[in-house]
Amino acid sequence: MERARKLANRAILKRLVSQSKQSRSNEIPSSSLYRPSRYVSSLSPYTFQARNNAKSFNTQQARSISVEALKPSDTFPRRHNSATPEEQTKMAEFCGFQSLDALIDATVPQSIRSESMKLPKFDSGLTESQMIEHMQNLASKNKVFKSYIGMGYYNTYVPPVILRNLLENPAWYTQYTPYQAEISQGRLESLLNYQTMITDLTGLPMSNASLLDEGTAAAEAMAMCNNILKGKKKTFLIASNCHPQTIDICKTRADGFDLKVVTVDLKDIDYKSGDVCGVLVQYPGTEGEILDYGEFIKNAHAHGVKVVMASDLLALTMLKPPGELGADIVVGSAQRFGVPMGYGGPHAAFLATSQEYKRMMPGRIIGLSVDSTGKPALRMAMQTREQHIRRDKATSNICTAQALLANMAAMYAVYHGPEGLKTIGQRVHGLAGTFSAGLKKLGTVEVQDLPFFDTVKVKCSDAKAIADVANKNDINLRIVDNNTITVSFDETTTLEDVDDLFKVFALGKPVPFTAQSIAQEVENLIPSGLTRETPFLTHQIFNSYHTEHELLRYLHKLQSKDLSLCHSMIPLGSCTMKLNATTEMMPVTWPSFANIHPFAPTEQAAGYQEMFDDLGALLCTITGFDSFSLQPNAGAAGEYAGLMVIRAYHMSRGDHHRNVCIIPVSAHGTNPASAAMCGMKIVAVGTDAKGNINIEELRKAAEANKDNLAALMVTYPSTHGVYEEGIDEICKIIHDNGGQVYMDGANMNAQVGLTSPGFIGADVCHLNLHKTFCIPHGGGGPGMGPIGVKKHLAPYLPSHPVVPTGGIPSPDKSEPLGAISAAPWGSALILPISYTYIAMMGSKGLTDASKIAILSANYMAKRLEKHYPVLFRGVNGTCAHEFIIDLRGFKNTAGIEPEDVAKRLIDYGFHGPTMSWPVPGTLMIEPTESESKAELDRFCDALISIREEIAQIEKGNVDINNNVLKGAPHPPSMLMADAWTKPYSREYAAYPAPWLRSAKFWPTTGRVDNVYGDRNLICTLLPVSEMAEEKAATA
């Protein structure tokens, strides 16, 4: 029996080995879609098992266990970098090189190759289990006190159904900005809910789909006021009752616009100068007071001054909406709607305004349109005002914002509904009122007399002494000055917490009552003239999903409409849609990281501070810089911060005249938009036929502006996906003419471990942690854009007015720039993601990631070059980590545009590559190191198949205007309609490739009509009656 079993096993092994050999002999890629064996790795687990078993059968003597076999099995790089060593060699050979290293040597210029990178602390990389233990250790060093600091940040309950099914769900957090509307209808609906929530609560008809934080939203509103008045008035007033971080950000931002910011008490505001473009007030004020701004706003308008109001969404469930008071623009944060404080972020901010100023709004806006069948569909509206189109003339440099957090806040409103939100608001207000009444009974301190919502202002003889007593009881209060404390309440506060506060403020005296005993005596303290009477959140969506089952199903319904990395690769060029590993994501929702106030004493955040120091050191090693600021909370914010640091450096040397920024025409639109925000004059330089910066044109521009040259903005590798051989010469030209080199870190995924911005010659660079370092894109945010600088720029890194910060490591001297973001360390809660990625990958893992990203791009380019022209390659015929295929010829031969190819890719189950940038009429493809060879082949096969579909049009076999590409994508509603008038079959429309039979992602709408949507702009949920009218009108 035993002998028969062995013989059977040997027969099976022999067949497996034979099959694997046959599969390897057929390895060379083919454009045919009907060879499924090609999608199986030549070294599949079965093959490995067969080889190992064969060896064990052929070995008759016992073997000792090697030390290597006893090492931990949960190493991370092999889980992140998809291509196996054998696949790497075969892919390199297919590209014409003997090995991966030979390909890299031919691709990355030797003049900029750096020595092997050696990371501090994590050179060898931690395993996943070691990393979790390390993060738990860091978390244990953070002390979560009960926070009453307020200032725009509050404790909140994150409903578990939202925590698990949205924040912790890769189907929600792994998508990019919804550029392909047909496969983004779920989060587009949720973002429309967010916009509706904002417009309802603020009383203004237009809202964007999130901004970075409240402080930067206020700065954007200030810029709007300047633009509305066409820059004719150059003073912006800020009431002293605004949050200090907001005031500081506006002051920093104003420098670039040549605006004068004046902070003044409300009672002292006047407009006699005739030079005031706008005024910012807080409602409720930073110290809690509620003021009636009605007459104030009328007076401002009488003098031609625009009014910006920073407000609190929860307060607006009880207060008269700012729009009804006459405010022109309303800004604020949605953080307390179910988003953790996270030591400062990420949180979704908002900006609402009137229809009159809609084209001057910053950020993404979601609007309603129709699809190809006339059915309502959503998409991003009014994109022509954004930076990727208008460049330096854009309303803002903002692109990535906070979509994931906006979705959380929107779902919080959906879950609670209007009545639930009112109840929470009334409860918070009642607790604050109870506390105020109790303090008056105690008589140990003086309580403010002005009306308040959630924040009680207390006058005392020694604020620090009271705060120290509170700290000993794990309570944080806000010290305003030596004699003033504020106490801000939130939805997590209980009556027992109020009793604890009474003990603190009793100053050693007994407390003869309880909060519960006096709560029933407390009345609504909001004046009748400021009490909200207008209903809000009346749409059915906000009144339907109030049980967990219902919200769970609603969340699942929406996520099912969106293609994410759960389904397939997202090959967007310049976006780096790589793996967001589970171990990296886990610490984000741990309470010890999530529930700390950004202005808590730093000793309570020792774990965070240790991580910041280590992360700063790691990033310095990776980039070749001397210091880092972690404050910028998006790539665009990093660009702006880096240029402002350069500006501050020139100013410190007396070079006030240096304001010229040279930018290649191929640069991303944020570059000129950011430079314009810093008050720089932009000089554009062209590129040559190979996609490189025209060095002679650059030299002439630099020399012509040598007395005024501030900076060059350059992306490396270039936006054309090429390592420019002359990058070191380019940096030298700028330095020789008195300028600084700003490197856009968008393509850092092709530098790590191979070269670095500092080694190349850059003076400052921002890193997109949401690209190279694995923070998920969240469907349009969050992001992080920390900036690294050389030593001479380190003194000018951003600081903060509440918690002083600067470079990491700290420079010898400091002349810091003002605040760039509302929180001292930006969106600190997501920094553990990048930290764990770097620590687990180690030096070699990170270097291998860069190499494999380059290999994957070259492999795909080689596969596609027979079917599509590949633009721009380096001197040895290779590309960097991304490449561009040229579709321009198809417009003449087949009437096909890049959009047609992108929409047809949806039918194949893929998100389209980046369209028509940096070259119009092209697609830019970036595969990343995280995609397997099988997935790369599947995408290539889809594009090759589409090329055959184009060929059928070119041959005249298919109508040029009515074909499968022009009709794409094909949702089930279209395919199952009674009438089918297309000249191709329903089956061909739906199943153009064999792999789709086993698993297919279905779009839920036909091609969306962007022009119709912009001409009939609707950016909120319509009431049911209006939806019926709209449907009838489109029909």
From Swiss-Prot:
Query: Which branch of life, at top level?
Result: Eukaryota
In the record, biological process GO terms are: glycine decarboxylation via glycine cleavage system
Q: Which residues span the membrane?
A: none
**Which residues carry the post-translational modification N6-(pyridoxal phosphate)lysine, per the record?**
K771
Protein EC = 1.4.4.2
Question: Which catalysed reactions does the entry list for this protein?
Answer: N(6)-[(R)-lipoyl]-L-lysyl-[glycine-cleavage complex H protein] + glycine + H(+) = N(6)-[(R)-S(8)-aminomethyldihydrolipoyl]-L-lysyl-[glycine-cleavage complex H protein] + CO2
According to the record, the signal peptide region is none
Q: List keywords of the entry alphabetically.
A: Mitochondrion, Oxidoreductase, Pyridoxal phosphate, Transit peptide
Q: Which CDD domains match?
A: GDC-P
Q: Where is the transit peptide?
A: 1-64
* Database matches in InterPro entries: GcvP, GDC-P_C, GDC-P_N, GDC_P, PyrdxlP-dep_Trfase, PyrdxlP-dep_Trfase_major, PyrdxlP-dep_Trfase_small
Listed cofactors = pyridoxal 5'-phosphate
Query: GO cellular-component terms in the record?
Result: glycine cleavage complex; mitochondrion
Q: One MF term in GO for this entry?
A: pyridoxal phosphate binding
Cell location: Mitochondrion
* Enzyme class at the top of the EC tree: oxidoreductase
| UniProt function note | The glycine cleavage system catalyzes the degradation of glycine. The P protein binds the alpha-amino group of glycine through its pyridoxal phosphate cofactor; CO(2) is released and the remaining methylamine moiety is then transferred to the lipoamide cofactor of the H protein.
**What quaternary arrangement does the UniProt entry report?**
Homodimer. The glycine cleavage system is composed of four proteins: P, T, L and H.
What is stated as this protein's family in its record? Belongs to the GcvP family.
Protein name in the entry: Glycine dehydrogenase (decarboxylating), mitochondrial
Which organism encodes this protein? Solanum tuberosum
